Amino acid sequence: MANEMEFEKPILELKSKIADLKEYNETSDVDLTNEIEKLEKRLAKLESSIYSNMTAWDKFQVARHPERPTTLDYISLLFEDFMELHGDRAFGDDAAIVGGIATFHGIPVTVIGHQRGKDTKDNLHRNFGMPHPEGFRKALRLMKQADKFGRPIICFIDTKGAYPGRAAEERGQSEAIARNLYEMSDMKVPIISIVIGEGGSGGALALGVGNQIFMLENAVFSVISPEGAAAILWKDASQAKKAAESMRITAGDLFELGITDGIIPEVKGGAHRDLNAQAEEINKTITKSLHALMAFSEEQLIEQRYEKFKKIGVYDTL
């Protein structure tokens, strides 16, 4: 089957066998109902075993799945009256980042996120979700607007990283990312960041200075891809599996390290299996987080955000 992952092969083989038996059962005089029921029970156990024991590399594959829901998929289900806003008012628009104003259960909010493409043409248009400086500056423009009008900011993170091309560097890629980090740290409104797929390095951090940061269960967050790390450490990109295990990139790892504030459960097999169910899980998390943060004063929001990031990386205190 297309877009299925290596670790799912035993599941797919058993599903195929069950499908063949069901087809044969409908056209023959032999009753295979009992055999089919046994295989379906075996399939349920196999799925439970495989999906509950996924390695970091397995989760990385799920995070990169071509059918994984994108920012716009979630926006259409989670928010009302979304109006997309374009451009950074300096150079141009960047389709790798989408953003605009909307309402969330009646609360006016600003929503921003990385946007991958759905097919080859769309991916080329959106640069595979890797923003140029104008994308980060567009995001910052929308954040400043939200800060001015008192709208909470909700960010969806899903990028391999900021685009490393020459033109992007010439237009100030590193400055654009650094500026976002600087400005976000002093915003007077609640900021919620959710890693829905890949959280790649500075490209992810530019939308990640939140009062609360969450990750979907199979999302990843790292300074470099496993392939890139393997190429540097072992001069061999084929060692990506080994690198993924060493880098501590999973939602569980990041929560344990105190970098994120929670893990959003995923539907069995990954978010791409059931978009509506996955959106509902995200809805619960945003609702709870937003109501908690909206009780803070402006000064408390800034202080809480500052203290949160100051504690990251602390091993011990005297």
From Swiss-Prot:
GO BP terms in the entry: fatty acid biosynthetic process; malonyl-CoA biosynthetic process
Keyword ATP-binding: yes
Record field: catalytic activity: N(6)-carboxybiotinyl-L-lysyl-[protein] + acetyl-CoA = N(6)-biotinyl-L-lysyl-[protein] + malonyl-CoA
Keyword Nucleotide-binding: yes
Disulphide bridges, residue numbers: none
Pathway the protein acts in: Lipid metabolism; malonyl-CoA biosynthesis; malonyl-CoA from acetyl-CoA: step 1/1
Any one annotated GO CC term: acetyl-CoA carboxylase complex
Keywords: ATP-binding, Cytoplasm, Fatty acid biosynthesis, Fatty acid metabolism, Lipid biosynthesis, Lipid metabolism, Nucleotide-binding, Transferase
Subcellular location(s) per record: Cytoplasm
SUPFAM superfamilies: ClpP/crotonase (SSF52096)
EC number: 2.1.3.15
Domain of life: Bacteria
Pfam entry (one): ACCA
CoA carboxyltransferase C-terminal domain sequence ranges: 38-292
GO molecular function terms listed in the Swiss-Prot or TrEMBL record: acetyl-CoA carboxylase activity; ATP binding; carboxyl- or carbamoyltransferase activity
HAMAP family membership: AcetylCoA_CT_alpha
Function as written in the Swiss-Prot or TrEMBL entry: Component of the acetyl coenzyme A carboxylase (ACC) complex. First, biotin carboxylase catalyzes the carboxylation of biotin on its carrier protein (BCCP) and then the CO(2) group is transferred by the carboxyltransferase to acetyl-CoA to form malonyl-CoA.
Quaternary structure annotation from Swiss-Prot or TrEMBL: Acetyl-CoA carboxylase is a heterohexamer composed of biotin carboxyl carrier protein (AccB), biotin carboxylase (AccC) and two subunits each of ACCase subunit alpha (AccA) and ACCase subunit beta (AccD).
Family as reported in the entry's similarity comment: Belongs to the AccA family.
Protein name according to UniProt: Acetyl-coenzyme A carboxylase carboxyl transferase subunit alpha
Species of origin: Listeria monocytogenes serotype 4b (strain CLIP80459)
Gene: accA
